Amino acid sequence: MNRFSYTLRKRAAARFFILALFVAAGIFLLTFFSRFGLRSPVLTEISPSVGSAGDILVLRGQNFGSSRGSSYVELCGNRLTESGYVSWDDDLIKVIVPGNTEDGLVYVATRAGKSNPEFFANELAIPVEMPENPMFSVPIITELSLAEAAPGQIISISGRNFGSSRGESNVYFSARREGEREESVPNLDGYDTKVETQKYVGFLTPSEADFDFEYWSENEIRVRVPDGAASGSVFVATSEGRSALQPFLVKSRVGKKTWTGRHTYLIQVGADFHNIKGGDAAAVTIHLPRPIVSALQPEAIMTESNPEPALLDYRGNSIFQITPADKTSAKNYSGARQNYVVTSCGMESEVYKDYVGLFKEKDRMLYKAYTRADEIIPADDKAVLELLPKIVFQVKNPYRQAELVFDYFVQNYKILPKTRNGDANPLDLIDKKRGDAYDFAVLYAALLRCAGVPCRILSGVLIDSDKQTRNHWWNEFYIENFGWLPVDTALGVGMEFKAFQGEPNSGKYFFGNIDAQRVAFSFAYKAIKQSLLSNKTVSMPRSFALQSIWEESTADVESYSSYWIVPAVLGIY
C-alpha cells in the first residue's frame, strides 16, 4: 500500500481537499466548453446611426440570444440600465438612447463575449453649416427714444434693416385684453425669422385710420403709440423677419381702460344680383365691406369667399365683378358671400377729468380729420353752431363737453323703433326730438367736432341674444394722451336691446364704456371713386358701412336687381 492511499484512508481533510479539487476542475471544464461552444454576438447594423436622447436605437445582427438574461448593450462607454431596454431577440434589439449619451461605440455583450462595434453619433454634437447671417436683412432695434409713453405720443425707433418704405412692414405693440393669450412671438434665438402671413397674438399695430405712422426709413421709424397698446414689448417686422422684443411701458395719467369681456362671431356678409341685362361689355362691380380691425375689434379673419373676389382688400372692401354670363340658375342669378371670424371686446373706462387738457397738437392729422365737417357730418351747419353753446356753455374740458352732449341727448331726445329713410336729414333730430341711431350718431359727432373734440362715427351691426342683427351706428371721441372713448347715444336713451346675459346696460353706462355685442365695418365715411365717369353707381345710406359707392355698373348694363343682406351671425363662440 503506498503512502498516498494510506493518507486518503486515514485523513478526512485529505479526502475533502481531493474532492474539492475534482469539483473545481469540473466546473472549470464545463464553463470553458460552454463558453467556447457558444457563438459570439455579431452586430451588423444600428439605426439610426445619428440620433439624440430619447430616440429608439435598433440593433440588428445575430447570436444575441432569445432573451436578455445577463447580456447587455454598451452605448458610448456606458452599460444601459434596466429601463433602457425595449425588446430583445436573437437578431434584433431595441433600446432607448439615454440622456447622457455622446459620440461613441455600440457593443452587444453576451456570455459568449462582446460583438464587433458600430459607431453612434449624437446629432446635437455634429457641426452644421451655418445659415446665411441674417444680421444684414433682419430688422434690428438699437434704441427707443422713450422707454415709457402715453397713447398717441410719438416714439422714435432707431436701428437698421427697416426698409426704405413701410410697404407691408409694421410695428407691433403689446395689447393685453380679457381672455386673450399671452404675447406669442416665435423664438428668435436661431434667427429663423422669416415672416409669413400670421397674427401675433397679444399684439396690435398702429392704426392707419388714426394716422399713427409719421415717418419710415431704413434706420428710423417715428410712430405714435396706438390706442389700446399696453405695457410689455415692441418690435418691428418686415418681409425679412422680426426684430428682438424691446421692453416698453404705456402709461397715461388721464385714466385707464379695462377690458370687460369678448365674443367671437362667425358672421356672413353678401349681396344677391338678379336678371342682369346688357351688352357684351355689361358688368356690375360690388364693393363688399369688410369688418374693421381696431383695439376693440382686434381680429377679423375671412374664412370663406364665394366666389373669389377680383380684389381681396381694397380700402377695406372686397371687390367683385359680375356679368350677365355669370349665371348659377336659369333666372340669371349671381352674387357674393363672405364669412368672417370677428372678435369683439367690451371695455370700461375710468377718466380723471382734472387731468384732461385741451388738445395741443392741432396740426396732427387725426385732429384735422376728425374735427372737420365731411360728407355726412355737418359740423359747420348753422343749426349745430347754434345748439352747441346751449349744451356746453363755457366748459372747455373736452371730456366734460362730450359728457354734457351725451347727457343732453338722454334728457331731450327719443329713439325711433325703426331706421328712417336714407335721404332723411339727421339734423331733423334737433327740432323733432326723435330720430334713429344714425341720426343720433351724426348729430353727436357734428356737435363734438364743432367744439373741437375729435369724433367719428362707427357703423356696423348690433347683435341681440337671439343672434338677430340690425344696422347700428355709434361714436368714438378722442382724448389726447389717452385714446378713443366709445359713446352709444341710441342705447343711452333706451333703445331696445337684448343682452346675452342679465339685464342690458342703459343710460350713462354707454358714455365711455361699450359692450361686445357688435361688429363694426366702418370707422368713418369712405368716399369711393367710380372706376369710369360713365359708370352708374348705387349708394346705400344708413347701412352697416359708411361708403359712397356700393354698386357700380358699366354703361352697357340695361337693368338688374340687387338685394343686400344685413350681416348675419352664423355662430357665437
Q: Which stretches of residues belong to each language-model region?
A:
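Acidic low-complexity segments
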Residues: 313-416, 424-427, 431
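Intrinsically disordered, low-complexity N-terminal segments that are enriched in acidic
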Residues: 247-345
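Proline/serine/threonine-rich low-complexity linkers at boundaries of modular beta-sandwich domains
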Residues: 30-41, 123-138
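N-terminal Lys/Arg-rich, disordered targeting/topogenic segments
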Residues: 1-13
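Hydrophobic membrane-insertion alpha-helices, especially the h-region
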Residues: 15-34
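Low-complexity, Gly/Ser/Thr/Pro-rich intrinsically disordered linker/tail segments
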Residues: 508-573
